[in-house]
């Protein structure tokens, strides 16, 4: 049996920067199955050797953000020795900026993630997105920077989490014909509500993949075109009733949709595209 490919995210801090870059790059390959394993706080030679030993056991790419020069050089030596592919995320950037400014970097792992007010705002936003995901508690709509509405599998949750990592508090609500709309939705200023629209064909494809993943029958009503059209018609009626802007997410990446959401809520305007 061929071993599953894996990416080791290695850092002498928390590893978030390397993890985000890795996931952004992986998105170019769609749904390919690649495991990501994060190894934070690798700041001594022994810990580093343990990571390398694990990487040698299977097809592995090492992606790393190592600030301390001695640890970075040792990692480079080990991956060269064992012929393990590796990508240095921070090294070339640090060297380039150092040459530009004519001054060395401060060499403080985790400096970018210091526990300042900005960091805590992001944590708070992520917790908010989790708590008010999928319409769990509509009371959160009134505290949100944005409320995303749309049918199931229209990328509401991924966009909410993406914006949360940029310190925006985002709630979302699935639109289901059989479920009444919460009164709180109509108390939110319309420019803070954003509808997510997706084509029937794309939604059918996404839902077919979803039911395969969770083991439902392929003829489940959830992915039938008749049901999809019914839900999309209902969603359009809700968009009009609320008076919100609408984004067509059919061919948009999560990042693109998030940018459009910010344009809408920051300008305070209602318009569709």
Curated annotation (Swiss-Prot):
Listed InterPro entries: Kinase-pyrophosphorylase, PPDK_reg
Superkingdom classification of source: Bacteria
Sequence positions that bind ADP: 150-157
Keywords tagged on the record: Kinase, Nucleotide-binding, Serine/threonine-protein kinase, Transferase
Reaction catalysed by this enzyme: N(tele)-phospho-L-histidyl/L-threonyl-[pyruvate, phosphate dikinase] + ADP = N(tele)-phospho-L-histidyl/O-phospho-L-threonyl-[pyruvate, phosphate dikinase] + AMP + H(+); N(tele)-phospho-L-histidyl/O-phospho-L-threonyl-[pyruvate, phosphate dikinase] + phosphate + H(+) = N(tele)-phospho-L-histidyl/L-threonyl-[pyruvate, phosphate dikinase] + diphosphate
Keyword Isomerase assigned: no
GO MF: ADP binding; ATP binding; phosphotransferase activity, phosphate group as acceptor; protein serine/threonine kinase activity
Broad enzyme group: transferase
EC number assigned by the record: 2.7.11.32, 2.7.4.27
Role played: Bifunctional serine/threonine kinase and phosphorylase involved in the regulation of the pyruvate, phosphate dikinase (PPDK) by catalyzing its phosphorylation/dephosphorylation.
Family the entry assigns: Belongs to the pyruvate, phosphate/water dikinase regulatory protein family. PDRP subfamily.
Annotated NCBIfam families: PRK05339.1 (NF003742)
UniProt protein name: Putative pyruvate, phosphate dikinase regulatory protein
